[in-house]
Amino acid sequence: MKLFILAVGHKMPGWIASGFDEYTKRMPPELRIELREIKPELRSGGRSAESVMAAERQKIEAALPKGARIVALDERGRDWTTMQLAQALPAWQQDGRDVAFVIGGADGLDPELKARADVLLRISSMTLPHGMVRVLLAEQLYRAWSITQNHPYHRA
C-alpha cells in the first residue's frame, strides 16, 4: 500500500518542504508517502468559487491513483484522534488499496469530490495554511505508524 497526498497548491516555502520531507523520509518502505501537487485554478475574471472548485476537482480526479481509498480533508469532516488514525492504518494495509489524502485549494473541495470520499476527515478545528496541513498530515501519518510499531516516537 502506498499513501498519496494530493494537495492543491504549489511553490510552497522551503520550510514547508523541509518539514514535509522530514516525516516522509522516516516512513517505512511499505508505507511510502508520495506528494502530488495540483496547480490551483485562478480566481480571476469573476469566476465563482464553485467553478474554481469544479475545475480543481477534475485535476484532482485525474491525479488520483486508480482504485485508491479517498480521504478528503475538510473542516466539516470527522474529528479523528491520532489513535484512530493508528487503528485505521493496519486495516487499510490489509485491504491493500492505496490511500489518497486530498487537500483542497483556497475555496475548499468540490462537493462532488467530498461526496465520493470514503472518509471525510478534519485535521483541525482551526483554519490552517494549506502548506502547513501537508506537514501536519505527514507527521500524523508517521506518528500513527510509530504507534502501530511500538516505536518510542509516540510517548503519550
UniProtKB/Swiss-Prot annotation:
Source organism superkingdom: Bacteria
Gene3D superfamilies: 3.40.1280.10
GO MF: rRNA (pseudouridine-N3-)-methyltransferase activity
Protein keywords: Cytoplasm, Methyltransferase, rRNA processing, S-adenosyl-L-methionine, Transferase
Coiled-coil ranges (or none): none
Residues that hold S-adenosyl-L-methionine according to the record: L73, G104, I123, S124, S125, M126, T127, L128
Subcellular compartments: Cytoplasm
One GO cellular component, as annotated: cytoplasm
Entry EC number(s): 2.1.1.177
Recorded catalytic activity of this chain's protein: pseudouridine(1915) in 23S rRNA + S-adenosyl-L-methionine = N(3)-methylpseudouridine(1915) in 23S rRNA + S-adenosyl-L-homocysteine + H(+)
CDD domains named in the record: RlmH-like (cd18081)
Top-tier EC class: transferase
Similarity comment: family membership: Belongs to the RNA methyltransferase RlmH family.
Its job: Specifically methylates the pseudouridine at position 1915 (m3Psi1915) in 23S rRNA.
Oligomeric and partner information: Homodimer.
NCBIfam families registered for this protein in UniProt: PRK00103.1-4, tRNA_RlmH_YbeA
UniProt protein name: Ribosomal RNA large subunit methyltransferase H
Encoding gene (name): rlmH
